Amino acid sequence: MEKVQQTIRAARGTELQTKGWVQEAALRMLMNNLDPEVAEKPEELVVYGGIGRAARNWESYHAIVDSLKTLENDETLLVQSGKPVAIFKSHEDAPRVLLANSNLVPKWANWDHFRELEKKGLMMYGQMTAGSWIYIGTQGILQGTYETFGEAARQHFDGSLKGTVTITAGLGGMGGAQPLAVTMNGGVVIAIDVDKRSIDRRIEKRYCDKYTESLEEALAIANEYKEKKEPISIGLLGNAAEILPELVNRNIIPDLVTDQTSAHDPLNGYIPVGYTVEEAAKLREEDPERYVQLSKESMKKHVEAMLAMQEKGAITFDYGNNIRQVAFDEGLKNAFDFPGFVPAFIRPLFCEGKGPFRWVALSGDPEDIYKTDEVILREFADNEHLCNWIRMARQQVEFQGLPSRICWLGYGERAKFGRIINEMVANGELSAPIVIGRDHLDCGSVASPNRETESMKDGSDAVADWPILNALINSVNGASWVSVHHGGGVGMGYSLHAGMVIVADGTEAAAKRIERVLTSDPGMGVVRHVDAGYDLAVQTAKEKGVNIPMMK
């Protein structure tokens, strides 16, 4: 697609360019997704995750902007794979935007067919929060990554990663959270990436501490800090599919090993062994079929090394990029011998309706976020783990684009927080409305058998009714915009998922919508896990009064 060099930045303050705050919020969040501080390749409309875009092409982007500027308070804009296709009369409590991105009929749900359609200009890849306009930069995945490594520490290392070394790879928009998440848990991490720009970006934003091109130097620093039991993160330039086998050959085994390279997309994401970023780009253009095959062969080597490390005692887990599936398809029959991060560490949180809840200050004023931090510290003071997160985030997380915050809140907590935020906007404590949203990676909004719904207790991993029901209930309850996507995180054919965003503009109507949406949305997570037979979900549903007709 054509590259357009222009700097897009969301407006700040209280002056509207649209006919209402919900439309304004959608416009600012679309533009914020493409802010150079936030997006990975804004000139190509790519936000994160290989080719995860905010709009299909530049013509569609400008048409969306124009549509949002003229959209009435009782109209709904429909967006099909990043292209605005209709505006219908609806009503004031309806979503202002409905988005469907990258969805394919199952028999045709593969990368080859997607790329044919993309080439014809008929489709785009929306990832999760790229095409649904609620990406907030690397902070968006940071607490989830912090929670994952924290749970690994609780299960295997007496509650802290002090004195441990983690080896991982992939420092893009998602994987870039890993170095800081490990050091927040007290550990040492060597994070590998083949693209120097990705490492530089994480260092610039204080997500990573040091840069090196030398494996020897990385190991020396890691060992020094491991001995001192002090945290440090080292960005190592190289290809994990070369470096991990080399470590296995030398019998250098880390305490933990995982991976967040863009393995979900063998063509536009992963870079094969032996190629620089520039050489890979040339091969991708000249011979895409050979590129994909080389990528898949490299992924197989990568997973073989992870399995070898697991055999030698490393705590090993898949971080949701579908690399095990590719290795399995390439003939590595034991590729799934190490678990995914959700069944290993996160599912109990999902059973309580917990997930990555985020909010953004449309004012552009960091003080608005700091005031909301104080709300969390006051209202949820009994949750020491959550409060520790907020305190660390304030100190260590640099905002990208509009100021924002993320934390994991559960059923009941999200609605309570939303009510308070809306009241703060109403009484002027906050200088402009707040956008409340979440990742599609949530407790009740995704079907992804190699990630969020891997190894479900009842075998319902591939049942995709749940994200559809999630989107439907959020729409009728008045979310500001709702999205249904395919292929996020793990690639074409492997996931369906839904997103929602709601705007706290201080009005009484918003208060009612917030109460409904922020109850039903996490409620779907509780319901989904009750249905699968999880005792903790049943206990949560009974304690919180979630109405589930056939619950025993």
UniProtKB/Swiss-Prot annotation:
PROSITE patterns reported for this sequence: UROCANASE
Gene Ontology biological-process entries: L-histidine catabolic process to glutamate and formamide; L-histidine catabolic process to glutamate and formate
A single GO cellular-component term on record: cytoplasm
Amino acids binding NAD(+): 49-50, 127, 173-175, 193, 239-240, 260-264, 270-271, 319, 489
Source superkingdom: Bacteria
Database matches in SUPFAM superfamilies: Urocanase
Catalysis: reaction(s): 4-imidazolone-5-propanoate = trans-urocanate + H2O
Protein purpose: Catalyzes the conversion of urocanate to 4-imidazolone-5-propionate.
Protein name: Urocanate hydratase
Annotated source species: Bacillus mycoides (strain KBAB4) (Bacillus weihenstephanensis)
Name of the gene this protein is made from: hutU
